[in-house]
């Protein structure tokens, strides 16, 4: 099949989808499909970069950038004739282009909401999203042929909102890092903060956004002494800047106990961590959890994420936010050897269950069913 994988941005500052959509496109190309990985960036030239059957094109993003309009991307989609048009994310003009291209080519439109249909996310800035649904990508959600989600919970979100189209549950894959990548990450982070070599590190690595409960995590961390542990907040500034979070930590008396860093252009800091923390209000998948586990770092997250199996595997804890404090204290009290053993269990689990090849095969079968239904 000739498949378009469209994501508004592949820039690292836009979080997990910038990595996971690329991984999916590579996985689909790896099983023989012809894949166009299409995105936008200010100043993009649309030049084709071909790797086997994967054709990556980054088109110019125009203003207003918040909605990611791109006439060159629109033209490409309308003139290329893809057999499947798969768009990742909502509330952006690129989804309107995807719908128009699918209609013109009589091709199924598949949408991956990427967590944007959870109850918390759907109601956050609700007016802006109602505006986008009506004016930025009109009719796209109602006329999609099918949905791709990364967890059963995300499928339930779609049904709760009244959408009845077929849904494919296919989780993100994750690739283990190379030894060289991990070594470079350790050097980078310990050069930036020499204290990380001498203390145990609890890591938050995600967007600095209210959805992630970053302020609440700061408050919880500072509520009691944490011994020789330090909390590293490495993230992508979004609703909060580094300066705002550093100011918050200072006002709460957390200097020396919490470090805040813009992780946008830095290597992932998992290699310096002994425990990973993700206290989100909601996650459709939580790629950072898989990335942490594959590296052997155990995880404490909330039950608003799809990582409940952490409990049965023994690779960490998945609990309601109102109960988060007790397992946090318990995990911080474990020996380095015990936490490392948890990490090994987690690494074995995600290496077995979360591969891009497996996800690509699942989606490929779903695409074919949608094409058959449209004939």
Where are these regions (language model features)?
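Glycosyltransferase donor-sugar binding loop
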Residues: 39-44, 174, 205, 230-244
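Membrane-proximal helix-turn-helix segments that form the acceptor-binding/catalytic region
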Residues: 104, 130-147
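Conserved donor-binding/catalytic core segment of Leloir-type glycosyltransferases
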Residues: 148, 174, 185, 190-212, ...
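Carbohydrate-associated surface elements
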Residues: 153, 173
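Nucleotide-activated donor-binding/catalytic signature segment of Leloir-type glycosyltransferases, i.e.
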Residues: 243-263
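Aromatic "clamp/platform" in nucleotide-sugar-dependent glycosyltransferases that forms part
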Residues: 281
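Short hydrophobic beta-strand element within catalytic cores of glycosyltransferases
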Residues: 298-301
């Amino acid at each position: 099949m000739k498949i378009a994988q469209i994501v508004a941005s592949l820039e690292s500052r836009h979080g997990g989808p910038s990595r996971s959509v690329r991984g999916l496109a590579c996985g689909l190309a790896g099983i023989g499909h012809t894949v166009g990985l299409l995105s936008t960036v200010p100043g993009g030239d649309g030049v084709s970069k071909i790797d086997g059957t994967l054709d990556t094109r980054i088109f110019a993003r125009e203003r207003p950038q918040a909605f990611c309009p791109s006439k060159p991307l629109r033209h490409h989609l309308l003139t290329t004739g893809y057999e499947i048009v798969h768009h990742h994310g909502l509330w952006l003009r690129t989804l309107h282009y995807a719908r128009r291209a699918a209609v013109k080519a009589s091709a199924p439109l598949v949408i991956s909401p990427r967590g944007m249909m959870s109850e918390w996310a759907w109601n956050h800035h609700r007016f802006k999203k109602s505006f986008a649904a009506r004016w930025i990508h009109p009719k796209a959600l109602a006329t999609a042929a099918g949905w791709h989600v990364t967890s059963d919970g995300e499928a339930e979100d779609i049904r709760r909102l009244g959408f009845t189209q077929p849904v494919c549950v296919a989780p993100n894959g994750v690739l283990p890092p190379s030894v060289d990548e991990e070594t470079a990450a350790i050097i980078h982070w310990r050069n930036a903060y020499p204290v990380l070599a001498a203390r145990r590190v609890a890591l938050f690595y995600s967007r600095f956004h209210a959805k992630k409960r970053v302020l609440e995590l700061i408050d919880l961390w500072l509520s009691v002494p944490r011994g020789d542990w330090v909390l590293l907040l490495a993230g992508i500034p979004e609703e909060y800047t580094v300066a705002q979070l550093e100011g918050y930590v200072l006002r709460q008396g957390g200097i020396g106990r919490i470090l805040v860093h813009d992780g946008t252009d830095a290597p992932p800091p998992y290699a310096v961590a002994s425990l990973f923390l993700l206290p989100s209000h909601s996650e459709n998948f939580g790629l950072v959890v898989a990335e942490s586990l594959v590296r052997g770092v155990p995880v404490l997250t909330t039950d608003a994420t799809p990582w409940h199996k952490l409990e049965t595997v023994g690779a960490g804890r998945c609990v309601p936010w109102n109960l988060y404090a007790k397992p946090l204290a318990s995990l911080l009290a474990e020996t380095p050897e015990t936490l490392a053993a948890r990490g090994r269990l987690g690494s074995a689990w995600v290496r077995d269950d979360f591969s891009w090849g497996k996800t690509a095969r699942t989606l490929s079968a779903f695409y074919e069913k949608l094409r058959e239904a449209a004939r």
